[in-house]
Amino acid sequence: MHEYIIQGGFPVNGTIKASGNKNAALPCIAAAILSEEPIILKNIPEIEDVFVMLQVFEALGGHYEKIEKNVFKLQIEKVKTSKIPEDLATKIRASILFAGPLLARTGKAVLPPPGGDVIGRRRLDTHFLALTELGARVETDQNFSFIAHKLMGEDIFLDEASVTATENAIMAASLAEGTTIISNAASEPHVQELCKMLNKMGAKISGVGSNILTIEGVKKLNGTEHRIGPDYMEIGSFIGLAAVTRGQLKITDVEPRDMRPLRVAFGKLGIGWSLEGTTLTVPDKQKMQVNCDLGGMIPKIDDAPWPGFPPDLTSIMTVIATQVEGTVLIHEKMFESRMFFVDKLIGMGARITLCDPHRAVISGPSSLHGSELVSPDVRAGMAMVIAACCARGESIIRNVYQIERGYEHLVERLKSIGVKIELKEK
């Protein structure tokens, strides 16, 4: 077990490169099941979740090798089993992403209930709906078993714009017979990334970036090389870190289009940045002040499917709001347990009223003090790191495995921009 020891109160300064998008890397790894040929993935973040997905890929009969930093070669000439090992499935929710590819390649997929962050009720019904529409039969006992003699294209309307259910449907439909239309599809950048990779492999997917996808099934998918785009969730986290520590930070390898929803939400808290090409600069000593809605109403920051504000950043925004002059409502619509970490911020000196499991009213600025904290999930854990960096004194954060599931070489990279952080073995 490891823990972070952070001395707060120091501004960040310098340049940091954005890592590859974790939420794009995971489905792209699963999609390698769809071809017998080699897949080379570049800009893959070297984080816990990626390595667990690679272990699942290997357990199914695949082989992978690290060619160089952040570049991996994957190949699975023959699938030796269609069952995900239970010990790996329980480590990561994204193991569900192997259902569609296994079903398309072998006609069967057996998955133990997936693990991952405990941030509320995370239903799997939309996955079942999509795959059964394509011709699969679902059996449930201790595991979820998907069986299909032949997948057939279908007109599918998803009951929610689930990212992973959309990705499963896309992968299964790519090798199905006939044409599939997916309505109410998720359109997040990582879904677009998967579609781009599959099209390079020979898939025929149109409507990429919209909520209606058309997929013409093909008989075979080929190998390819694909570079994963930058992680806008990580970029948003670093913007927040710079703002609350009053430092100047340059973030390189940014995709400007991904930043538009973030600019709107951060702007409500008086936080801005400049973009020059793919380099984003957060200026120091910004006047962080809540911009009230018309009529002087308290502004609301709420999450929504893309191109709305991403739910993975609501924890980060909650911490930022504690350092902004004024009052704001944070409304986490999607996950009812994500806001429960705010009691730790209150213990550090934040003024927060938790209205219900989905909503919190934050008034600032508050002077935070160091504390002992336990990371409940990857995003709340990073929010705690940001809180510790702007707090007075020393903070200790435990269960940092959760944070390192989503943030690459975090301690090393934070040190490079001036954060007083140490990794200690407990």
From Swiss-Prot:
Q: Name one GO cellular component term.
A: cytoplasm
Q: Which CDD domains match?
A: UdpNAET
UniProt keyword Cell wall biogenesis/degradation, yes or no: yes
The annotated pathway is: Cell wall biogenesis; peptidoglycan biosynthesis
Which annotated residues bind phosphoenolpyruvate? K22, N23
Positions in coiled-coil regions: none
Predominant location category: cytoplasm
Query: Which sites bind UDP-N-acetyl-alpha-D-glucosamine?
Result: R93, D312, M334
Places the protein is found: Cytoplasm
Tell me what reaction this enzyme catalyses: phosphoenolpyruvate + UDP-N-acetyl-alpha-D-glucosamine = UDP-N-acetyl-3-O-(1-carboxyvinyl)-alpha-D-glucosamine + phosphate
List UniProt keywords, sorted A-Z. Cell cycle, Cell division, Cell shape, Cell wall biogenesis/degradation, Cytoplasm, Peptidoglycan synthesis, Transferase
GO biological-process terms attached to the record:
cell division; cell wall organization; peptidoglycan biosynthetic process; regulation of cell shape; UDP-N-acetylgalactosamine biosynthetic process
Q: Give the protein family.
A: Belongs to the EPSP synthase family. MurA subfamily.
Q: What does this protein do?
A: Cell wall formation. Adds enolpyruvyl to UDP-N-acetylglucosamine.
What's the protein name? UDP-N-acetylglucosamine 1-carboxyvinyltransferase
Organism, by scientific name, is: Treponema denticola (strain ATCC 35405 / DSM 14222 / CIP 103919 / JCM 8153 / KCTC 15104)
